Amino acid sequence: MATFVELSTKAKMPIVGLGTWKSPLGKVKEAVKVAIDAGYRHIDCAYVYQNEHEVGEAIQEKIQEKAVKREDLFIVSKLWPTFFERPLVRKAFEKTLKDLKLSYLDVYLIHWPQGFKSGDDLFPKDDKGNAIGGKATFLDAWEAMEELVDEGLVKALGVSNFSHFQIEKLLNKPGLKYKPVTNQVECHPYLTQEKLIQYCHSKGITVTAYSPLGSPDRPWAKPEDPSLLEDPKIKEIAAKHKKTAAQVLIRFHIQRNVIVIPKSVTPARIVENIQVFDFKLSDEEMATILSFNRNWRACNVLQSSHLEDYPFNAEY
């Protein structure tokens, strides 16, 4: 049922996955179980979401029920930027692996390129509320992550929220052992990322779209922010296909060969979000949706925009 995108490692990454950012404890376990039953095989996780232990319980239960085998699942997690120092990479990774109750990850990503001050505080800020940078860079972290691949603990590495300049920096790193297989970025019709997708694809790097529905439940949403799910043109296209706005927004990525990870903890929506393989948007509809771009970001983490590796000062 699920279709895949082939990575540069020849591994197959399911093109639709379940996002777990902002999925609350007490709900995320059930969400993952519902997703696996609905045919999802790709689950997107992260250390900073602080819910990996519940995701892990759900995966374990489904494996024990023989509903799915580990090798059929594609599990992604991310290294948070307070852990860029080599020994800390290992520590953070081991906690993720233990919480997820797995013996390996399919892909391990660098969550953001800008390093934060090391320590227990995941969001180290100064008295003005600005993020405090760290000494280690994403290049330091990458070397430690490559060791995890050598040890069979991770199948492949990737990045998230990287601009093409940062990917370039990584690809040009002397002694680079493993290239990133994906760049996970915010992407939806108001932020179509055409140049970045073109660049990544030209380098053999897939793109994974987070917040494909425009992250309507983000805690910092303002009433005047645009709403994709309520966009009349999206709703019009959806009605034509007898689909929902969310299904159109997800299908839009699939047709660009972009992996997409909608988040939901509502069982009916989790099921709905993967029922996207039985219709096709026309070239005209795709062009219309692409024309909505306004470079609007739901997630711009402005409190770290002064740091050297902040990604969004670049055009793409």
Curated annotation (Swiss-Prot):
Its EC number is 1.1.1.300, 1.1.1.54. GO terms for molecular function: alcohol dehydrogenase (NADP+) activity; aldo-keto reductase (NADPH) activity; aldose reductase (NADPH) activity; all-trans-retinol dehydrogenase (NADP+) activity; allyl-alcohol dehydrogenase activity; geranylgeranyl reductase activity; indanol dehydrogenase activity; retinal dehydrogenase activity. It is found in: Lysosome; Secreted. The record marks 78 as: Lowers pKa of active site Tyr. Signal peptide: none annotated. This is Aldo-keto reductase family 1 member B10. Retinaldehyde reductase activity is inhibited by tolrestat. Pathway: Cofactor metabolism; retinol metabolism. The lineage of its organism: Eukaryota, Metazoa, Chordata, Craniata, Vertebrata. GO terms for cellular component: cytosol; extracellular region; lysosome; mitochondrion. NADP(+) binds at residues 20-22, 44, 160-161, 184, 210-217, 261-273. Catalyzes the NADPH-dependent reduction of a wide variety of carbonyl-containing compounds to their corresponding alcohols. Displays strong enzymatic activity toward all-trans-retinal, 9-cis-retinal, and 13-cis-retinal. Plays a critical role in detoxifying dietary and lipid-derived unsaturated carbonyls, such as crotonaldehyde, 4-hydroxynonenal, trans-2-hexenal, trans-2,4-hexadienal and their glutathione-conjugates carbonyls (GS-carbonyls). Displays no reductase activity towards glucose. The keyword NADP applies. The active site is at residue 49. InterPro entries: AKR, Aldo/ket_reductase_CS, NADP_OxRdtase_dom, NADP_OxRdtase_dom_sf. Keywords: Acetylation, Lipid metabolism, Lysosome, NADP, Oxidoreductase, Secreted. CDD domains: AKR_AKR1B1-19. Substrate binds at residue 111. GO terms for biological process: cellular detoxification of aldehyde; daunorubicin metabolic process; doxorubicin metabolic process; farnesol catabolic process; retinoid metabolic process. Changing residue 301 to L: Reduced catalytic activity towards all-trans-retinaldehyde. It comes from the Eukaryota. The keyword Zinc does not apply. The modification N6-acetyllysine is found at residues 125, 263. It catalyses: all-trans-retinol + NADP(+) = all-trans-retinal + NADPH + H(+); 9-cis-retinol + NADP(+) = 9-cis-retinal + NADPH + H(+); 13-cis-retinol + NADP(+) = 13-cis-retinal + NADPH + H(+); allyl alcohol + NADP(+) = acrolein + NADPH + H(+). Found in many tissues. Highly expressed in small intestine, colon and adrenal gland. Induction: Overexpressed in certain types of cancers, including hepatocellular carcinoma and lung cancer associated with tobacco smoking. Belongs to the aldo/keto reductase family.
